Every structure is written in structure tokens, then in C-alpha cells.
Amino acid sequence: EITLGLSHLIHKVLNPRAPFEFTLERIKNCAWANLPLSMAVALLFKKRFDPRGPMDDATFDAECAKLTSEIDRTASSETSRTVLLTMLDAVRHVLRTNYHVHGRFGFAVRLDPKFLRNDDRPALPYGVFFVHGRGFDGFHVRFQDIARGGLRVVMPRSEAQHGREAERLYDEVYGLAFAQQLKNKDIPEGGAKAAILLEPGAGIDRCVKAFVNSLLDLITPEPETRNQIVDLSGLDELIYLGPDENITPDHIEWVVRRAALRGYPLPTAFMSSKPGAGINHKVYGVTSEGVNVFLDVALNAVGIDPRKQPFTVKITGGPDGDVAGNMIRILDRDYGGNAKVV
């Protein structure tokens, strides 16, 4: 399980460097073809975070050096060598894991964000969580300690589509979280985002619950869970989620109930847009209303009165998305036939 989870994680590091060399299948094949080495990495991970007696830094560094030498000497190919060394580097950057938590629903790690940094991801997030479970992978990224952002579920219909989505999963979460960080420049909360990528046919309810439970494993201060986790970060962390694509009111209510059951200190704040509390941003189209204000000003600035003259609009997204779907409705409400979506 550790080897498989790390394989899915390092895919997000290696694939941007060489998409054809480092497909997910090739990464997993390299791990299986060098099983003694990949198992040694997994065993090191297991010992490092064993709550009964975690490996100290000096011993860990010595074991990493020894294993690096072994990989350099015996890996079956240069591609395999890169895969195994990156897997070992991933272990170095793990700050917390739920691997030893009894009754867990997925394999989760809290990462040092430097592990996923590259030239296309120059801004360093405050925190990154990765969860691998049966039928899904998921990330949560935030750019400040206190940050809010939506949780979305990506549901590909085919293996080919899933492969494309897997390649861009972290970049999508990173990009959306960073955009939210910029949008939130004038308020105390920073930007965050979470996304769960489902394999075709995987059940959305089970995967959402497994992802959320795995996050709670790593952040709840509940003593029984905390005693099963070795924390190298020294941080008490709070996460604030909001509903995004494919998250239903039933999911929202379950998430809040589960957070309370797991001893999370602020369960009602763990997920926003709860039925019966506050306003439903989706129903009122809050974000889309703001976009429409900017659109109206921009059109008038270039000499187009949108209430009297026709204009065309290109929307990146779709009617199934919260912002785009509400935007189409608002365009029709305010501008009628003058607004032509292309």
C-alpha cells in the first residue's frame, strides 16, 4: 500500500518532467520490477512514523544514505533509478501520515510543499495533503495557515480521460488554490482548494467519505487518533472546506457530522454552505454575480451597452459548474438575447 501510494504521489513530480517516460503505469512497473528496493523504501517509511518507536533523524538520514547507494548500484534501469530515488525523496518530505491509524479509510500524508515545487509551480504553498485510496487520489493545498477553498470531485468517464486528469490533478488543485489566494488578498483567509479524482466506476459517496476521514486522521486533536501519529511538523492545523463540483448537500451534512464525531475542534466550520446555516452560494450565484459586475463595467468601457447592444461571451467551464452555470442564468436575466455564449 505504501509503495502504491507513493507511486501515485511521485507521478505528480516526475510526469511534468517527461510525460512519456513517467506515466503512472511505468512508475508502478518500475517499483514492481525493483521490488526489494521499493519495499525497502516502504519499510523505511513505516519505521520512520511508527508511533511505538519512531526512527530518529540521525538513524533516518543514515538509512536514506545507505538506500540511495543501494538504488544507485542495483536499480534495473535509469528510469527505475529515478523513480526509486524520487520515492525515497518523497519519504523525506512527509511530515505526518495516517498509515498506523487503526480503521483508516485511505493512505494519507501531510507533505513539505517543497517536494512538489517546480518551475511551473514557483509559489510555495503553506501546506499540502495527499490521500490515496481505493479508486481515488486527492490533494488539499492551502497558501496560508488559515485558508478556505472548495472541495470538488472529478469523475472521468473513461480510462483515457482518467489518465489525462491524473496528469494534471495536482496542478489543477495548486492553480485553483493560488488563484483563490490572490482573490482573497483583502480578507484574512488565504486561498485553498481540494480535489478528489475518481477512477471510472468508483463510488462518489465512498470516496468523498474516505478522503475526508483521511484528512481528519491527520488534523484532529482527538487523543486516540493523535497517539497513533508521529508528527514531524509540530503544527496544529485547521482546514476549512467549501462545496464545489459534485459535492451534494448530503455530503456537506455528513462531513460536518463526521468532523464532530472525530473530535475536530470546529466541526461546523469544517465545511461551509450547510443546509439551514447561512446562505447557499450556489443557489444565489454569489461568485457569478460578482463576475457579472466586472463584465458590465468592461463592456461599457469599450463602448458596448450590454442592455442595448449584442455581444458575445466565451465561458471557460460549463453549465454543470457552479460559476458558469449561474453565469449563463444571470446573462439571460440581465441582457436577454443580447448575450450570445459561443
Residue ranges and their predicted role:
Residues 126-146, 256-259, 331:
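Short beta-strand elements
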Residues 133-135, 141-165:
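Function-dense linear segments that define catalytic or interfacial modules
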Residues 244, 318-320:
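An acidic- and aromatic-residue-enriched active-site/binding cleft used to recognize and process polar
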Residues 321, 325-342:
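Dinucleotide-binding/catalytic capping subdomain of oxidoreductase cores
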Residues 3, 285-293, 321-325:
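Domain-scale recognition of functional cores that engage charged ligands
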Residues 313-315:
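Hydrophobic Val/Ile/Leu positions in short beta-strands of Rossmann-like dinucleotide-binding domains
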Residues 136-138, 160, 165, 173-311, ...:
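Glycine/serine-rich phosphate-binding loop and adjoining beta1-alpha1 elements at the start
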Residues 1-128:
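Often metal-dependent polyanion-binding catalytic scaffolds in large enzymes
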